[in-house]
Amino acid sequence: MRLSTSAIALCVGLLVARGAAAVELPQRWVSAGGALSEWVSALGAQARLVGVDTTSQHPESLKALPSIGYQRQLSAEGILSLSPQILIGTEEMGPPPVLSQIRSAGVQVELFSAQPDLPTLQNTLQRLGRLLGSEAQATALFDGYQQQLVQQQAWVSQAQTTAKAPGVLLLLGHAGGKPLIAGKDTAADWLLQQAGGRNLATHSGYKPFSVESLAGLTPDVLVFSDRALTGDAAREALFKQNPILASTPAAKTGRVLELDPTLLVGGLGPRLPQSLVKLSAGFYPAESAKATAAQ
């Protein structure tokens, strides 16, 4: 059977259209959000990144890329000097006039939600998958992520059959000074809940820590994230700058845990499930020890 000229033309047109669509995918990316940069890398597209913001610290190789500064205080000149085709970030990215200037220069600007929940993450990965031409890989990443969380929740449920959920406060600071208490509707709150903790903070967002804010609260566990220091130096700075914390049950029993602050930026990132395992072990040390001994 011979194909008509019109049929052949249609087939050729479809092939050309598909090829053009593939070619038109943005190849030069700038990312202003730690979690988004990590997901782009996890999708095998780190080579497309030509610039990242200061919250993009993982994987380590991202630190070699040009920095565009802090995600909330971007400069159009700095970003445009990298000749990007696309700029991605969360709704925290700004300021708005800078984003408008970047759009006017012909750069595609894509905003993602930083809401810490699975439906939002699924949407984020689907969009990134389409923009990168890696939709199947994005779906597989989300499915694997979700499975890790299911396993984590099963472990927490088992641990809570013999131990109650600890009361927890999460403090985010800079060299120990003026820490913020993580409240509801934050990635930190999501982390604490998923790890099996009970966030004692009842406010929304982040609230400055004070002696008054600690009144009536008796945290079993303190979790701290420091943007400037790590390890023992961060812990010592926290208690030196905020001596009232030494009176908490958490400090007296040594249940003070450190959390990488980059995990709290830009929504749910790929390293969160592993961090949940570590937090849960700190929340339920006896149960964690039993599980380790049984292995």
What are these regions (language model features)?
Residues 23-28, 97-176, 198-204, 252-295:
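Extracytoplasmic substrate-binding proteins
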Residues 76-83, 210-218:
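Short helices/loops that flank or line small-molecule/ion binding pockets
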Residues 95-104, 224-240:
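A ligand-binding cleft/hinge motif common to bilobed small-molecule-binding domains
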